[in-house]
């Protein structure tokens, strides 16, 4: 069966959409979040900046070996009704009573995972090891960053229901890869978060409010772009692959009024604030004095299992 160039491009773009926010963006977020921290805790994070940067994408890599991982990166709010989705109990145990755990897992559990990882990070800072702190700091940073992405709040996560396949990688990978060097990374100091679960829900809802604009602007840019102006064929390492043209990426970024930069900035502040808050709740320990010992797993997370999706 023959396929058109456009169909081929869409297929390749779908296969390329394999990492939330894009590895480049996640690593940038974690690195920049360190500079939001107060002087009493920043030395530890600065000493381990490279390690933390590399761990920023570990949660995405786990999706290929851990069947419980995928559902932690998103929540399909559209399957629950309309904004502000007041029919979803914000607390996990209440939500399980209404929808059952299997239903919640099938629709994504992102805000609850952020809250569980927060508790893990508090434990790690209080009585864990340096390894534990780095693991949970990286993981909670990854999840809260995913919560800042509009396409992580819908079942139409890659435009597959609106004839916009590939939009996920376009929004969260291609745009930051092309423009991150021009971004303003001054996002202020980390703030103490009283209620991490409420904080996670608020960010998810903020992201969902941007979903219509995310989809509609891509449609408009596509409509005014010539047929051969959206995709290009590239050759690298002897292999042919498709990619959005730099002109299309630029047009879409402009149409979004720098939405991607703003959500990345929000991610940086959120990551730093969660790290800082966990440190406060742990009693402001000297993290450099932590010893090495085996991590204690979070029992709640062990119980979670969900099939992988192509791109979360």
Task: Indicate where each model-derived feature is located.
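N-terminal, motif-rich segments that launch catalysis or mediate targeting to/interaction with membranes
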Residues: 19-135, 139, 155-265, 269-312
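Alpha-helical and His/Cys-centered functional microenvironments
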Residues: 11, 30, 148
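Bacterial N-terminal signal peptides that target proteins for export
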Residues: 1-9
């Amino acid at each position: 069966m023959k396929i058109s160039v456009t169909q081929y491009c869409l297929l390749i773009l779908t296969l390329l959409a394999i990492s939330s926010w894009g590895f480049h963006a996640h690593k940038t977020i974690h690195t920049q979040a360190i500079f939001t921290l107060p002087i009493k805790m920043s030395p530890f994070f600065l000493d381990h900046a490279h390690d933390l940067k590399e761990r920023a994408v570990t949660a995405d890599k786990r999706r290929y070996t851990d069947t419980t991982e995928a559902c932690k990166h998103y929540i399909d709010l559209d399957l629950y009704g309309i904004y502000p989705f007041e029919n979803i109990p914000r607390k996990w145990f209440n939500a399980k009573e209404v929808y059952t755990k299997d239903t919640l897992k099938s629709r994504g559990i992102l805000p609850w995972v952020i809250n569980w990882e927060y508790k893990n990070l508090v434990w790690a800072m209080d009585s864990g090891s340096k390894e534990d702190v780095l693991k949970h700091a990286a993981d909670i940073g990854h999840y809260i960053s995913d919560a800042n992405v509009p396409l992580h709040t819908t079942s139409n996560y890659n435009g597959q229901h609106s004839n916009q396949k590939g939009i996920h990688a376009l929004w969260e990978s291609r745009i930051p890869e092309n423009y991150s060097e021009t971004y303003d990374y001054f996002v202020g100091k980390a703030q103490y978060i009283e209620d991490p679960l409420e904080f996670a829900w608020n960010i998810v809802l903020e992201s969902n409010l941007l979903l219509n604009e995310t989809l509609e602007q891509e449609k408009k840019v596509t409509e005014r772009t010539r047929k051969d102006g959206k995709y290009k064929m590239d050759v690298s390492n002897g292999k042919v692959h498709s990619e959005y043209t730099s002109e299309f990426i630029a047009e879409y970024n402009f149409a979004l009024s720098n939405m991607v930069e703003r959500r990345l900035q929000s991610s940086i502040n959120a990551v730093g604030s969660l790290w800082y808050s966990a440190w406060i709740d742990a009693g402001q320990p000297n993290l450099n004095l932590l010893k090495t010992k085996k991590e204690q797993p979070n029992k709640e997370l062990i119980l979670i299992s969900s099939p992988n999706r192509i791109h979360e």
